[in-house]
């Protein structure tokens, strides 16, 4: 690993106009981080990455690098881009356990963070360092949100999140696990108890339904529910995954690791929403892909569907008669939305047309 990242760092051209940085959603100064690492200043590189993004080590594993930093690297136009994800992971993983960030004086003001997913963790770190008294309210047993309960271990080791929890506590952040705001406690209760600001970052845990017959049958499940704890599901030997995003890839690859013999992914179109890398990994694991598949109903024995043909612009040119695909179980992975528990129990909050918290 060390030799690999050193060699990758040496490949960086240090462009005057670094396209890799432009491709990063948070404008990470990639050339500077690489140069610090290459010249033996790994600690400074780790500090720089952490200051720009407290979740640097996590992003090094789960970001869509091929569309962002690495996808914009000029070396990728004629060959392989600099694999900054590997460099970032090597630097940030080493830095995480012994970081000593500067802290502002205590302000004596309470802030509540509802949800400990990526947004909740990040804003908790930023506010705690600015002197606020931060409390995280997490509905599940451990922090992480979708990072822990929606991404498989083989993509993001849970031990990294356990290390983050230690760092949060080290910063003076209080964590209340197994506390879902909107049940026993509400946002109104938090305001009553002196929290001067409340950040709601509860994620999108409500699966999107397909609205087809058979969706409520006992062998049909949703991706976001399955990924929370795959070990409690008995999927049989033949699984159909409906959907073609990264979550669908996570489901398919996890199911194979849990003993399912055959996994088939149904894609509505002739390309996938998942990253090329994740699709390649899924194919390498043995997942089979079927394109132009439009499920019409689910039965105890499998999925009925219509096969569509499309032109280059994505317009449907023909639709087949209904056909049958046998399987022992189905997992639907087409999207998720936000739950309305907090909005429905809080005075003055409203939902947007997209099912999210309405803001100014």
Put a short name on every predicted segment.
Residues 207-210, 230, 273, 313, ...:
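Glycine/Thr-rich phosphate-binding loops of Rossmann-like dinucleotide-binding domains
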Residues 9, 187-191, 231:
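Short hydrophobic/charged patches on amphipathic alpha-helices used for structural packing
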Residues 93-111, 223-237:
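A short, basic/flexible loop-to-alpha-helix module at the beginning of a structural domain
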């Amino acid at each position: 690993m060390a030799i690999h990242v050193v060699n990758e760092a040496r490949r960086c051209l240090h462009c005057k106009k670094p396209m890799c940085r432009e491709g990063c959603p948070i404008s990470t100064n990639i050339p500077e981080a690489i140069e610090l690492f290459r010249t033996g200043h790994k600690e400074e590189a780790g500090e720089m990455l952490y200051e720009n993004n407290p979740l640097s080590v996590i992003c090094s594993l789960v970001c869509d690098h091929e569309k962002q930093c690495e996808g914009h690297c000029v070396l990728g136009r004629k060959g392989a881009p600099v694999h900054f994800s590997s460099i970032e992971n090597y630097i940030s993983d080493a830095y995480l356990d012994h970081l000593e960030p500067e802290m502002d004086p205590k302000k004596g003001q309470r802030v509540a963070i509802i949800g400990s997913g990526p947004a909740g963790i990040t804003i908790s770190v930023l506010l705690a360092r600015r002197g606020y008294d931060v409390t995280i309210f997490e509905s599940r047993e451990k922090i992480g949100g979708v990072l822990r309960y929606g991404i498989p271990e083989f993509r993001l080791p849970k031990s990294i999140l356990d290390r983050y929890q230690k760092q949060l506590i080290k910063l003076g952040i209080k964590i209340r696990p197994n506390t879902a705001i909107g049940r026993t406690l509400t946002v109104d209760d938090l305001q009553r108890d002196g929290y001067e600001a409340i950040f709601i970052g509860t994620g999108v845990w409500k699966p999107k339904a397909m609205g087809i017959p058979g969706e409520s049958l006992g062998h049909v499940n949703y991706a976001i529910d399955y990924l929370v704890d795959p070990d409690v599901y008995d999927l049989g030997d033949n699984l159909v995954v409906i959907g073609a995003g990264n979550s669908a890839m996570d489901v398919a690859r996890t199911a194979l690791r849990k003993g399912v013999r055959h996994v088939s992914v149904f894609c509505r179109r002739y390309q996938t929403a998942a990253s090329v890398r994740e699709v390649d990994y899924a194919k390498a694991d043995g997942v089979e892909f079927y394109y132009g598949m439009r499920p019409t109903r689910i039965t105890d024995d499998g999925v009925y569907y219509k096969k569509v043909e499309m032109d280059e612009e994505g317009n449907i040119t023909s639709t087949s008669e209904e056909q049958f695909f046998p399987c022992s179980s189905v997992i639907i992975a087409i999207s998720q939305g936000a739950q309305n528990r907090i909005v429905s129990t809080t005075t003055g909050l409203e939902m947007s047309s997209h099912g999210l918290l309405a803001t100014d």
